[in-house]
Amino acid sequence: MSYSPYIGRFAPSPSGSLHFGSLIAALGSFLRARSQGGQWLVRIEDIDPPREVPGAADDILRTLDAFGLHWDGKLMYQSQRTEAYQAKIDVLLASGEAYFCQCTRKQIQAIGGVYDGRCRQLGHQSGAIRIVNRARVNHFHDGLMGEVAVPDSFAAEDFIIKRSDGLYAYQLAVVMDDAKTGITEVVRGADLIEASCRQLSLFNQFGYQAPAWMHLPLACAEAGFKLSKQNHATPVDKANPLPALKAALAFLGQPIPDAHSVESLLAQAVADFSVASIPRRREILIDGGG
């Protein structure tokens, strides 16, 4: 699938400083966009206040800048988009395409872990809000991993678009934001690969142009455990970006330029960038947590 012009993005959540795992996603999406002569946007996904760390968003942006990963256009903050999310939900509720659900996580686990739509016709006026999933997607093509499929039961589920605590769900926000900014390809970590099917469902149901997808291997300190802010992955060093940039290039299977500045390294990395060289694996074990 080809698009013109190319628009990519990096969308971190401000739950801590940028670490090596998130640098891989940032660098991979940046190189892909720049190698296509396209734009690279940055969006701060700050719609989950309990998980957010004060000052983390600004720290992430300063780190991107220190690493030469300069974004195009205006920054988007999801916290400034809540009126748009609510307006969409109001339309969905009014049209019968969404409904309130009062099922607990424990109740859903008791029936096998997949929600069965039992609240769809009950007329609740409070609780979580679920989409009536009319555009189910159980497979898609990934630009690195190839054909990806999910279980039919997962694809068919009426998933949550607004939580019972009043917070907007990731699936709704990311689809509306990608559509708003005209994203043509999403390049991100493989931990979100299954979520793409749900996002594709929303793109289709809302009549939005869906992007292409490319999911990069995750950096893991041990099998099944990606580097993350939650497990205290070491932040990358803003004062000395070259070693981490070179390590991230190596992780992505790219040649390491003989460069002594961030600018020259990235310029050569863009020129050399090859998707075919990226390992087609969901995770790669690395030494340590940095």
UniProtKB/Swiss-Prot annotation:
Q: Does the keyword Ribosomal protein apply?
A: no
The residues the record assigns to binding ATP are K229
Q: According to the UniProt entry, what is the EC number of this protein? A: 6.1.1.-
Instruction: Locate the residues binding L-glutamate.
Output: R9, F10, A11, P12, S13, E45, Y170, R188
A Gene Ontology molecular function term for this protein is: zinc ion binding
What UniProt keywords apply to this chain's record, in alphabetical order? Aminoacyl-tRNA synthetase, ATP-binding, Ligase, Metal-binding, Nucleotide-binding, Zinc
Motif, 'HIGH' region: chain positions: 12-22
The cofactor named in the record is: Zn(2+)
- Top-rank taxon of the source lineage equals Bacteria
Gene3D superfamilies for this protein: HUPs (3.40.50.620)
Family affiliation: Belongs to the class-I aminoacyl-tRNA synthetase family. GluQ subfamily.
The name under which this protein is listed is: Glutamyl-Q tRNA(Asp) synthetase
Q: Which organism is it from?
A: Shewanella amazonensis (strain ATCC BAA-1098 / SB2B)
Query: What gene, per UniProt, encodes this protein?
Result: gluQ
